[in-house]
Amino acid sequence: RYWPVIPVVDPNGFYTVESKIYQLTEGGRYKSQKDVMAHQLAFIVEPIKDWKINVELNYRSNYNFDHTDYQTVYGYDVSKNPYIIANQTSSVTEYAYKSNFFNPNIFTEYGKSLESGHNFKVMLGFQSELFKQRDITASQDGIMSEVATLNTTQTNAQNRGGYSEWATAGFFGRVNYDYK
């Protein structure tokens, strides 16, 4: 309710329009499900002495599903006749989103220290990122049953969606030398 001075019900026993109770209880629903899955794998291999291979793999996926339905909300006048106070037309909207992110980081290094005091180290590596996403939205007006789904609506169908992706890749290297 807005303020404590606004009455909850009118003299006929209906909720008052000003209390917004009808809009809250009968105006529709919003439901959202979000799932995030992340995996990481990292290991170091030393196939021969002083040569190390580092591997790091990262993967993340996001899934999002939203459901929104707007129901026509009625208030009642002093003669107990209904009139629309919110959502002239009932409607349902469904939204789905998915994204995937993959990031490998692989590098190898070899180091050798000689008894004469010379130290050598070589590193080579690769790093990349790949991100893909897609979404789709569908909506329709005129809910015909108690079950608010796209299949139970009748007019003004709309849909939209899209895909996008980007990627990067890079190679790197380094040579180090020092003496004693």
Predicted regions mapped to residue ranges:
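Transmembrane beta-barrel domains of outer membrane proteins
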Residues: 42-44, 56, 109-111, 174-178
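An active-site-proximal structural segment forming one wall of the substrate-binding cleft
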Residues: 51
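Surface-exposed loop/interface segments of Gram-negative outer-membrane beta-barrel transport/assembly proteins
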Residues: 1-36, 54-56, 60-170
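Outer-membrane beta-barrel channels and translocator barrels
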Residues: 46-48, 113-117, 180
